[in-house]
Amino acid sequence: MAGKAKFCAPEIQDNPDGWGPCSVPTAFKDIPYQPFSKADRLGKVSDWTGSVYQDRRYANKYQSQFGTGNQMFSYYHEEDETSFQLVDTSRTQRPGYMRNRNRFNQRGGYRRDNRGGRFQGQGGNMGMQNLSRGRDTRNKFQRKMQRNWGGGRHWSDKKTGGMHKRVASVTVREEWKVLEDGELDFPRLSKLNLPNVEEPETLYECGSVEYYDKAYDRVTTKNEVPLVGVNRVFHKVTTTDDPIISKLLSQGNVFATDAIISTLMTCTRSNYSWDIVVQRVGSKLFFDKRDDSEFDLLTVGETANDLNIDETSGINTPTNLSLEATFINQNFSQQVLKRGEVKTFDHPNPFVTDEDDSTVASVCYRYRKWDLGDGIQLIVRCEHDAIMQGPRGETCLVNIKTLNEWDPKMTGVDWRQKLDSQRGAVLATELKNNSCKLAKWTANSILAGSEYLKLGYVSRVNFLDTSKHTILGTQQFRPREFATQIALNMDNAWGVLRCIIDICMKQPEGKLLILKDPSKGVIRIYDIPNSTFETDEEDDDDDEDDVENDDGDDEKDEGDGED
């Protein structure tokens, strides 16, 4: 019995609080665990398999399902901000004669199974390089996905202002209060509809317009026409300063301009911040713009998701591009007209003074009235830019607008190469980048009753110079047909407008502010004091009164001296 082996019972670890051992041996302490799959193939020590297996079916043969997604033990070097510098990584456009040159070098060299070909040695290496380049591109995409999702950055940063910080058009003050039902999000507004809105009644027509020169319809990229600056006066008068609207107060209870109404109708497409002042006087509503606002400036690239435009972009900042686009639009709308051929309406332009009578821009104002139901009578001042002869010799009213090219490297489409042969692609790109602006123009034309909407394509002569431009072509649309092409639903537009009017009509007399949030798809309606935005005007009035009083005192003193 003494020579037999003795059985020693092993130590059993009982973990009453969970599953697994209670303690970790010192030999295995602090060893990280790498997740893996037993289905992975062995042979991953060096990842050279991408260039060996040129057939795409075997490109991911040894790729682990845990390999790319798990970055637990990856090494990340701390960023040294002192050595940070900006690098231009934008792709330069190749000249036409250098494009697709690799395609001809590979002819007969690389096939799927790498067999045959006159230049097989050279072409085979090219195929391996292409596969390696494909793997690098795939890895870059994976790293980008990890940064966007794993680093806390949302995929929709670009849509929510990730490219540059947008600011509100007006600073919200503490005493301003949002109405109880005054926060309207875009998804809810996009579901509203007001169908079967009757045709409007034209109450008043005034002004004079010139005829459109059809020679500009034949302009192409091969016979460009320089854009010439036109010295003409454009009146952008707000609603409450319009003398004609004051005469029509008895015929309606909601008053606005076409620019304000189209902004509200197409608000679900806007990304930039804007604001509109609403005044409730008795039973009437007046929609106004602020005097010191940028409401009348045209936006550029407002709805683009892939354009890196910010206030540090040199000449291509949002403010500079907006001023440039407005300058181009005004000059183009007057340059394409025939001098001397004028159509005068029944009443003169109400905003013209004796000083600028000879330099006023070609414009016709039509005051139109819509019945929106439930006692809502809307009167809008609409505008036409020109007049032209239709295909049957009839007289047609026209609205003239301009799209401008400022940098083809940013937009991805070179107008000088694509405008004549692929005009649809150019317009599609502009619709993607400037959807809100095009929708506003279309809504303006429909409100005014224009038969045609003329679009001009204007580009910089030198993309580093914002002072010289050239006309590359024009395009003509029927407003309602164009609204269908750009998916502008006028029933929804009327529904959005009616919803905002109803909310404002429920409020007592006073002043409201409609503000588009700069970073969210939301508009808010604030209740603001009646004296808001009027301090400067009151100060000016007080100064004028003081000057008049001083003059009166001086005259009195002079009279006393004579006595």
Swiss-Prot record:
Top-level taxonomic group: Eukaryota
Region (RNA gate): 294-308
Record keywords: Cytoplasm, Initiation factor, Protein biosynthesis, RNA-binding
Main location: cytoplasm
UniProt region (Disordered), positions on chain: 95-136, 528-563
Subcellular localization(s) per the UniProt record: Cytoplasm
Entry annotated with the keyword Acyltransferase: no
GO CC annotations on file: eukaryotic 43S preinitiation complex; eukaryotic 48S preinitiation complex; eukaryotic translation initiation factor 3 complex
Sequence ranges of Acidic residues compositional bias: 534-563
Gene Ontology terms: biological process: cap-dependent translational initiation; formation of cytoplasmic translation initiation complex; translational initiation
GO MF term set: mRNA cap binding; translation initiation factor activity
Subunit structure: Component of the eukaryotic translation initiation factor 3 (eIF-3) complex.
Function: mRNA cap-binding component of the eukaryotic translation initiation factor 3 (eIF-3) complex, which is involved in protein synthesis of a specialized repertoire of mRNAs and, together with other initiation factors, stimulates binding of mRNA and methionyl-tRNAi to the 40S ribosome. The eIF-3 complex specifically targets and initiates translation of a subset of mRNAs involved in cell proliferation. In the eIF-3 complex, eif3d specifically recognizes and binds the 7-methylguanosine cap of a subset of mRNAs.
Protein family membership: Belongs to the eIF-3 subunit D family.
Domain notes: The RNA gate region regulates mRNA cap recognition to prevent promiscuous mRNA-binding before assembly of eif3d into the full eukaryotic translation initiation factor 3 (eIF-3) complex.
Protein's name according to its UniProt entry: Eukaryotic translation initiation factor 3 subunit D
